[in-house]
Structure formats: structure tokens, C-alpha cells
Amino acid sequence: MRAPKTILVVAIFLLGSSFQDPQIRVEVEAVNLLVTVTGDKGRFVTKLVQQDFQSYEDGRLQEVTNFSQPTDLPLQIGLLIDTSSSVRLKLEFEKRAASDFLYSVMRDKDRALLVEFDTGVSLIHDFTRRPGSIVQSIKNLRAGGGTALIDAIYLVSRDKMFGGTDRKTVVILSDGRDLNSRHTLQEGIEMAHRAGVIVYAIGTTRFGTNLDDKGERTLEELTESTGGRAFFPYSTERLADAFDLINEELRTQYSLTFVPSNTKRDGKFREIKLKLPEHKNFNIRHRRGYFAPSE
């Protein structure tokens, strides 16, 4: 999502030397949505046209002004890896799967960054178009400390994902436990909405016998509210399958734009609902809404 042209957003990193005082100007004329449609047995549907979609904001029909079929718009990928003590035994499997994912998903115009989070949040590698460079950084990750999952989402969305027309995606690899964040779950979701970020998560809660329902709920809420999806493989061997599904989904998304009929600058959350009147058996997934600009 982009914000109105007249809005100037200044974001300053608060994470020390890893984050360097950027000033970000965000200009937005319309609401941009990335949309995933699935049909029978969860298969991706890729042949729909603009006339198939109806867009509603707070229950009011909106005119779709721009549309493209499964898009090759450049990707901005934020890879967030949990390196807390609770994932110590799983980390090596996670590192290999994450490395393979970057090699498979990134194309020439795509960019990715790497963040690790434990007790704090650290930018390990800034945006690059070279997956091999990030993979080398992934190899050096070590486990230890608490967990600041929500802070990682909040700070990456705020300080690295605002502005531009690229598709913005955060992929989390974590058990979903959060012990050290200063920001709440809702604050993390709100910042992702404001930055137009879709969140995907691969939860490691089902590895072994110790399930963490709270961790799973956190990951599900983060992903569902932003139009993404959470995966919970039962073994480290299935990590690659989850990454493959994320890769496939990122390459089968529709891009849709509408100009809101409600022009109030009240800063309120606007609920978005897309419908496929002639294809009611299809499932459609997108972010739940956006925040209007404020004076």
C-alpha cells in the first residue's frame, strides 16, 4: 500500500549501528493490493481478469483502476530468522532451507535483506540483489538469548519497507514465541499494514512433541491480517516444502489498484474486502485493510 502524495514519513532506525538514519518520503495515490486466489485442492488460480473482481472498502464498492495478472513486479524480501535459545536444535536445518529458498525465489530485479532476532533485533545484511551474499551471512548465524519477534516485524516494516512500487514481503522463520518485544502484536500488524507488507511465516512449533499453541496463534494472526500465510511443518525435512509453497504463491499473485471514494484524512483503519461474484467456490486472500492518511 502507498500513502497520499502529500504525506511525508520520516523513519529513523533505533537499532544502533546496523540501522542508519534514513529519511523516507512516501507518495501514494491509490490503494494497491496483492491478491492470491486458490481453487480446488488449494491450487493457485492464475487466469482471472479484472472484470472478475469486485473491491469493497468498509462495505462500499470501489472502482478498480489498475489490474495485472500474476505479476512479475520486483520483490523486496525481508528474511527474519529466529536465533533465540528455543530454536537452537533446529537452526542448522532452518539455515539450509532458508538459503535454498533465496536461491530459488530471487530473480534479477528482486532484493532481499536478512535480520536475526533473539533478545534484540539485528540487521545482518541490508538489501542486495545477490542471494549468495545473504546466504554467506546466514551460515554465520548462532542461537542464543530470548525472542523479540514482534519488534523485528515492526522495525523492518517501518524502517525498510516503506515507499516504492515493489512487492514487499516478510518471511519469518520462528516458533512464534515472543518474550522480549517492546511492541505489541497489534502494533506490529499495524506497521506492516502501513508499509504494505505481506507476512509469511514458517512455524517450527510442531518439530518434536512440544507444541506451542500461543506461538502458532501469533504467527497466524500476523500472516492472515496482512494477506500472507503461515505454515507449520511437522519435521525439519518438510521445511523446504513450506518455502517452495511461498515461492510459488509469490509468483502467482494478482496486482489490483483502486482509488478510495472516502477521501477523509482521519487516520482510521479501512477494511478491504474483495469478491469474485462469478467464482464463489474460489478462495481469495489479501490484506484486511489499510490506514487512511491523517492531517
Go through each PLM region and give its residues.
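Scaffold/interface architecture of coatomer-like assemblies
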Residues: F19-E295
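Bacterial Sec-dependent signal peptides at the C-terminal "C-region" and cleavage site
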Residues: A3-I7, A11-R25
